[in-house]
Regions:
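Mature catalytic core of soluble alpha/beta enzymes
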Residues: 2-224
Length: 224
């Protein structure tokens, strides 16, 4: 949260509820409703105690969609290891976590082409996580304009920063889950700068023209 400077904020629950990306006939939320939801957003209004959480704004609602799958994947991996499983893939849709290796070889994990259904890139992964956040995962079009599920907590609308997806390679899926969204919201330059400061984290950014950008050591994972 603090590294994103508010571009990523878990207190967007009211805003998330306004946008229905699963509707058969999607429609834009009312401008007044978005304005109202924005007043409930602000992670600095969260107070954590030993066993309780409170909000300075009683209308604030937390949404943990950006970390939930990663947390669950990590817990599944912990369980499998406890059961002495030494090779497995946990795939929660956009979140892939590998346990060990595949028959002594690395697992091959694809990154989806944002403009198609095939893979734009393949990675060799050993006992690590690969998480992607992209504008093609949940979206709709209204009057020719594209709206996706990664929402800007400052405007109430989808981010429009030239990025199509961000993929994070990490040891823990919860880290990759959060960082894929955080880095998307920061944009290419700031997002890559953040990743390059973090030990054990690599990233692949894809823009809306399908150009690829890599963190310092991400190409070490790419299958040529």
């Amino acid at each position: 949260l603090f590294r994103s400077n508010g571009t990523f904020d878990i207190t967007v629950g009211q805003l998330i509820d306004l946008w229905d990306f699963k509707a058969d006939t999607p429609k834009l939320p009312e401008t007044s409703a978005i304005a109202g939801a924005l007043t409930s957003i602000g992670y600095r209004g969260i107070t954590l105690n030993d066993s309780t959480i409170s909000f300075s704004n009683p209308n604030t609602i937390i949404d943990l969609g950006a970390v939930a799958k990663g947390y669950i994947a990590d817990k599944i991996k912990e369980y499998l290891i406890e059961q002495r499983v030494d090779s497995a893939i946990i795939n929660l849709g956009g979140n892939v976590l590998c346990v060990g290796k595949k028959n002594s070889d690395d697992f091959t994990i694809g990154i989806t082409d944002p403009k198609g259904s095939s893979d734009i890139l393949k990675l060799k992964i050993n006992d690590q996580s690969v998480v992607t956040s992209g504008i093609y995962q949940r979206y709709f079009e209204v009057e020719g304009k594209y709206y996706h599920h990664i929402l800007n907590p400052k405007t109430g609308y989808s981010y429009d920063n030239g990025l199509a997806s961000v993929t994070i390679i990490s040891n823990h899926s919860v880290d990759g889950d959060a960082l894929s969204t955080v880095c998307f919201t920061l944009g290419k330059e700031q997002g890559l700068a953040l990743v390059n400061q973090l030990a054990g984290i690599e990233a692949v950014f894809i823009d809306t023209n399908n150009a690829l950008y890599y963190s310092d050591h991400a190409k070490d994972y790419v299958i040529q």
